[in-house]
């Protein structure tokens, strides 16, 4: 209707201007009432919302910083754990090598000791055998000498004496 009045040039009925004044007055009254009763509450709600958003942003930033810090600490702990594991492995290898070296030395010493003992035992047995042979030869020599002194030997008697003595030696060795 207003458009027709402006475009066509018709005169507007008087009710349109009155309606505009009433609507404008009602709008002003509504604005004043809103300002007096509701504007403070609306501004408070908007302020609270703004503060909440700001707090949420701050909280998100703090969470991001805390997460970055925790990630850095986790990385440091991981590196520390890896270095500790490498140190433990290194120590275990060194300990194993030391144990191996110690066992090798002990085994070598034991083998050397056993060889030396065997040499000593063999030497002692040989000395005892030689001593025994010497004693037997001496006894045999004394027995032969005693038999010779007791008898006057002719070549046949001498041969018979040697044969009997050899037989007695054979019997003595068989009994041992």
From Swiss-Prot:
Cited CDD domains: ATP-synt_Fo_b (cd06503)
Keyword Transmembrane helix part of the UniProt annotation: yes
Record-annotated membrane-spanning stretches: 14-34
Top-level taxon in the UniProt lineage: Bacteria
Entry-linked Gene3D superfamilies: 6.10.250.1580
GO molecular function, one term: proton-transporting ATPase activity, rotational mechanism
GO cellular component term of the entry, any: plasma membrane
UniProt KW Membrane keyword: yes
Keywords linked to the UniProt accession: ATP synthesis, Cell membrane, CF(0), Hydrogen ion transport, Ion transport, Membrane, Transmembrane, Transmembrane helix, Transport
Location of the protein in the cell: Cell membrane
Annotated InterPro entries: ATP_synth_B-like_membr_sf, ATP_synth_b/b'su_bac/chlpt, ATP_synth_F0_bsu_bac, ATP_synthase_B_chain
Membrane topology, record value: Single-pass membrane protein
Function: F(1)F(0) ATP synthase produces ATP from ADP in the presence of a proton or sodium gradient. F-type ATPases consist of two structural domains, F(1) containing the extramembraneous catalytic core and F(0) containing the membrane proton channel, linked together by a central stalk and a peripheral stalk. During catalysis, ATP synthesis in the catalytic domain of F(1) is coupled via a rotary mechanism of the central stalk subunits to proton translocation.
Family: Belongs to the ATPase B chain family.
HAMAP family: ATP_synth_b_bprime
Assembly mode: F-type ATPases have 2 components, F(1) - the catalytic core - and F(0) - the membrane proton channel. F(1) has five subunits: alpha(3), beta(3), gamma(1), delta(1), epsilon(1). F(0) has three main subunits: a(1), b(2) and c(10-14). The alpha and beta chains form an alternating ring which encloses part of the gamma chain. F(1) is attached to F(0) by a central stalk formed by the gamma and epsilon chains, while a peripheral stalk is formed by the delta and b chains.
Protein name as catalogued: ATP synthase subunit b
Organism name: Enterococcus faecalis (strain ATCC 700802 / V583)
Name of the encoding gene: atpF
């Amino acid at each position: 209707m207003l458009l027709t009045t402006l475009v066509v040039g018709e005169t507007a009925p008087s009710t349109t201007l009155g309606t505009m004044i009433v609507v404008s007055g009602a709008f002003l009254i509504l604005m004043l009432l809103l300002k007096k009763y509701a504007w403070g509450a609306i501004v408070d709600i908007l302020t609270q919302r703004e503060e909440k958003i700001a707090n949420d942003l701050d909280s998100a930033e703090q969470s991001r910083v805390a997460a970055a810090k925790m990630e850095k600490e986790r990385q440091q702990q991981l590196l520390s754990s890896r270095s500790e594991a490498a140190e433990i492995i290194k120590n275990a290898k060194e300990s194993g090598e030391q144990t191996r070296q110690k066992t090798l030395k002990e085994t070598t010493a034991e083998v050397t000791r056993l060889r030396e003992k065997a040499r000593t035992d063999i030497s002692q047995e040989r000395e005892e055998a030689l001593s025994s042979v010497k004693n037997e030869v001496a006894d045999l020599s004394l027995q032969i000498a005693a038999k010779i002194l007791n008898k006057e030997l002719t070549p046949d008697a001498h041969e018979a004496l040697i044969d009997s003595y050899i037989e007695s030696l054979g019997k003595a060795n068989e009994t041992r």
